[in-house]
């Protein structure tokens, strides 16, 4: 993981957190609600600026950010009955402020996708596999396969998109040493049917001597309407995949807990993208922005969704729950959230390749 690639990924993550907090901040200020603090990160401030009413800061622990209101400050000079305190506003006004961070992340993700599809384009996965290379004198070459062919089906089984297509292709070939298999390929505008007999390797498994790549189609908008349409399709697909992923995590947490990624893992993933193809940082940013929105809307303490639950209860009961109870729940949730963040940072840091290589020599163990 190169330093520049890591910095690019960190920059993307920082921008997305800033967008989320700016959503809360803008929703409050546009309604005339007092805001005392706008912070990126938690813990002691690294940089700080005091505005006319609001303190702006970048803090040491990069696990999120927050917008603070004088309602939470017992030393605030603003009268408790000030109509522009958040707590004195109607439920709808407060709900707008609380949900604005999620909305900001979703809107920003959509505009990132518009930016990508308008300038670079999307690479959409299509069914089948591309053959970029055919080994000399291999079973595939003998059968007439050529570089650039797109494999559509094997043994009458239509290939899905990547990565399932790769798994299916390799499985069929390996299980068929010295057994002819029928392969349908697309070559230019033509469709051809080839019969390939995999040769056994040293382990007795079949091989045909080709390299495999995903079959991708680059979509680039030629006008504003196409940009909006393509971006909407990509946005819908990412939201659907994200919500499905969270549902699988929640419904089968024991098996999927190891897949939960913290900031370090996200930065590593983003750095790999930046190193291989920086243009994909648009889509990476949109993906993480949508993930931030989905995470924050979950009805859990210390998250925006948890605060919306309190508002819902207030609307049903006609009065808010006791303030001490709400504060206790939120503080407990914040401690648990920070603890989870620290755990994920430590775990993901220890799993980084260069750390894994460093630890044996540092500890003296092999």
Curated annotation (Swiss-Prot):
Cell compartments where the protein resides: Cell inner membrane
Keyword Acetylation: no
Cofactor(s) recorded in Swiss-Prot or TrEMBL: Zn(2+)
Cellular compartments per GO CC: plasma membrane
Gene Ontology molecular-function annotations: metal ion binding; metalloendopeptidase activity
Domain PDZ: 106-188
Keywords noted in UniProt: Cell inner membrane, Cell membrane, Hydrolase, Membrane, Metal-binding, Metalloprotease, Protease, Transmembrane, Transmembrane helix, Zinc
Residues the record marks as active site: 21
Family listed: Belongs to the peptidase M50B family.
Name of the protein described by the UniProt record: Putative zinc metalloprotease slr1821
The species this protein was found in: Synechocystis sp. (strain ATCC 27184 / PCC 6803 / Kazusa)
């Amino acid at each position: 993981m190169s330093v520049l690639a890591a910095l690019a990924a960190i920059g993307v993550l920082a921008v997305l957190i800033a967008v989320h907090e700016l959503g809360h901040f803008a929703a409050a200020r546009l309604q005339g609600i007092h805001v005392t603090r706008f912070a990126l990160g938690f813990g002691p401030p690294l940089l700080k600026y005091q505005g006319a009413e609001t303190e702006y800061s970048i803090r040491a622990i990069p696990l999120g950010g927050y917008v603070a209101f004088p309602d939470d400050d017992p030393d605030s000079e603003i009268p408790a009955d000030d109509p522009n305190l958040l707590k004195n506003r109607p439920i709808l006004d407060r709900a707008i402020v609380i949900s604005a961070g999620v909305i900001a992340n979703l809107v920003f993700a959509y505009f990132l996708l518009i930016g990508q599809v308008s300038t670079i384009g999307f690479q959409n996965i299509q069914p089948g596999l591309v053959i970029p290379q055919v080994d000399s004198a291999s079973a595939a070459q003998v059968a007439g396969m050529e570089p650039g062919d797109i494999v559509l089906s094997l043994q009458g089984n239509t290939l899905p998109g990547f990565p399932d297509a790769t798994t299916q292709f390799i499985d069929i070939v390996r299980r068929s040493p010295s057994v002819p298999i029928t392969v349908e390929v697309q070559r230019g505008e033509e469709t051809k049917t080839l019969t390939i007999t995999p040769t056994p390797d040293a382990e007795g498994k079949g091989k045909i001597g080709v390299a495999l790549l995903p079959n991708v189609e680059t979509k680039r908008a030629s006008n504003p309407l196409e940009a909006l349409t393509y971006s909407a399709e990509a946005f819908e697909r990412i939201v659907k995949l994200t919500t499905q992923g969270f549902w699988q995590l929640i419904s089968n947490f024991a098996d999927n807990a190891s897949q939960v990624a913290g900031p370090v893992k996200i930065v590593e993933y983003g750095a790999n993208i930046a190193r291989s193809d920086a243009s994909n940082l648009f889509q990476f940013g949109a993906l993480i922005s949508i993930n931030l929105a989905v995470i924050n809307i979950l009805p859990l303490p210390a998250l925006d969704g948890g605060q919306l639950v309190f508002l819902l209860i207030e609307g049903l009961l006609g009065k808010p729950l006791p303030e001490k109870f709400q504060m206790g729940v939120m503080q407990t949730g914040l401690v648990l959230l920070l603890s989870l963040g620290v755990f994920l940072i430590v775990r993901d840091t220890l799993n980084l390749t260069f750390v894994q290589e460093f630890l044996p020599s540092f500890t003296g163990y092999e």
